[in-house]
Each structure stands twice: as C-alpha cells, then as structure tokens.
Amino acid sequence: MNQWKEYSSLANISDQEAEELCQVLRRRIIQVVSQTDGPLASNLGAVELTVALHRVYDTSRDRLVFDVGHQCYVHKMLTGRNGQMETLRTFGGIAGFPKPAESIHDACIAGHASTAVSTLGMAIARTRLGEDYKVVALLGDGSLTGGLAYEGLSMAGQSGEPLVVILNDNGMSIDASMGGVAQHLAKQRLKPQYLQAREIYRKIMNATPPGRVLHRVFHRIKDAIKTSLLPCSMFEDMGFQYMGPVDGHDVKTLTRLLDYASKVNGPVLLHVKTIKGKGC
C-alpha cells in the first residue's frame, strides 16, 4: 500500500500494477474486518471497480456517491485513510460509510439504500453553475429493490445530464441469463472500435434532414433486435446509454469503459457483474 499512498498516483499506474494493487487491497480488507467487524463480502466484491474508478476520476473534485456506503472501504484506503482503518466503526475512529466531515473525497453521507441516483441534483447544479466536475452514482446491495432508485433513474435518463450510474450486480438476478448470441453481441458493444464508429455514424447521419430520417428508421430496427436479445431495454427506455454486462473483476476493461463513459455528453449506465466475497 505504501506505493499508492496518494489517490492521484492511480491515474498513471499500469494495468498490471492495478491488478497487483487489487490483491493487496483484498488482503488489507480481510485484515481490517477481522479486527473491526463490518461488511466483508460487499467490499471484497467491489475492489476492482473501486480501483478502476480512482484511475479515471479525481474524487477530490469529482462526485462519487455510494448507495448505502457499505462497499466504500477500498475508497477510504485509497484516499489517505489506510492508516486509520484499524479504527473503523469505533468511537472516535473513521466511519463505516462515506462522511464528508472525514474527507473531501466523500461527496455525501450514505447509509440508506436506493438514494445514490439523487446525484442528478449535483449534475444539474454543475451545469447551471458552469462547473466541470464529473458525477458518478454507484448502486449495489439490492438498491434496485427500492422505488426511489427507479424514480431517480427515470429523471436522470430524461434529463440528458452527463451522469454515470454504475449498477454493481452481485447476483440479484436482475436480468435473465443470456444465450451465446446475446453474450457475443454484448461483448461487441463494449469494444472501443464499436463505440467510436457509433459516434461517427451518429454525427454523419444527423448532419442532414434525410440522414436524420434514416437514422430514426435504423434506430428503431436496431432497438427491436436488441430488445429481443440483450438485457438493456429498461435502462435505454429511461434514456440511458447502456453498457454491459461487463466482468466487474477485470480492472483493465473497467478502466477503459469508465474512461469512455466519463466523456459521454449524457447519462450512461454501466452494468457490472461482480462476485460478493471474491478472494475470501
């Protein structure tokens, strides 16, 4: 951990170093929780995702909001609090959830499920004030069982505000299992070449009135095929650009997709599949 004392150093580490860091963090989580108690499985499952987030975003400026907050231990370790982790959840020690009074890297207090997409308010405030920070909401631990999450998703999708929502799906069976063709198509949709080609196609087609008409026709045909094969219809119907499902323990791919999502001028939902308690 001494090699990565400062969160900012993660932006320049290699993929191999990121993978090594994830293993170090897993051992550290087990060490800390064995002494202080607390949610072990959810934190072990979010290691690669949290490292990837810190490779892309600057949490001293960007807003990273955890739903519930029980999976924030790696975030705390990477933002100057690793040496205090033995005081976790003790009187006078650091909190077991994000706490702005504790660090500038904690955007707001969490503790209740289904509230993270309320970060839409931060995104709207950013736009109106002419600021340029990024906004990310991390959903997990059954947050989609609460109606408040769907209200937030509906409003965020229709707002058009640049906002990234990450769905940490650790086995809640949100979608039906996918067949071979659907899995292949999902992988193709995540490739950089596809993402770049789609943006170029969109700009060309929207440049002229006939192009816009053709774009709408092709878009409807594509949606009909995609809806029958891929588990993204609900989120795209809400107005999100859907990406996934993706392996939540592949830190290289996660970093690439988060970097892309951070540059999209609109709401993005990244669906990440993780294993609770991985490495334990």
Tell what function each PLM region has.
Residues G171-C280:
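Long, well-ordered, tryptophan-enriched scaffold segments
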Residues M1-T79, M234-F240, P245-L258, N265-I275:
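N-terminal amphipathic, basic-rich helices that act as targeting or association modules
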Residues G83-F97, G157-D175, A186, Q193-Q196:
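A glycine-rich helix N-cap at a beta->alpha junction
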Residues I29, Y57, A156, N170-G171:
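A generic secondary-structure signal for well-formed alpha-helical elements
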Residues P39-S159:
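Cofactor-binding active-site loop characterized by glycine-rich and histidine/acidic residues
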Residues M1-S9, R27-V32, I94-D106, Y133, ...:
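Gly-rich Lys/Arg/Thr-decorated short loops/hinges at beta-loop-alpha junctions or inter-strand turns
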Residues L10-I13, E17, L21, D37-G45, ...:
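Catalytic cores of large soluble enzymes that bind and process phosphate-bearing ligands
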Residues D67, L138-L139, V164-N168, H271-I275:
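Short beta-strand segments
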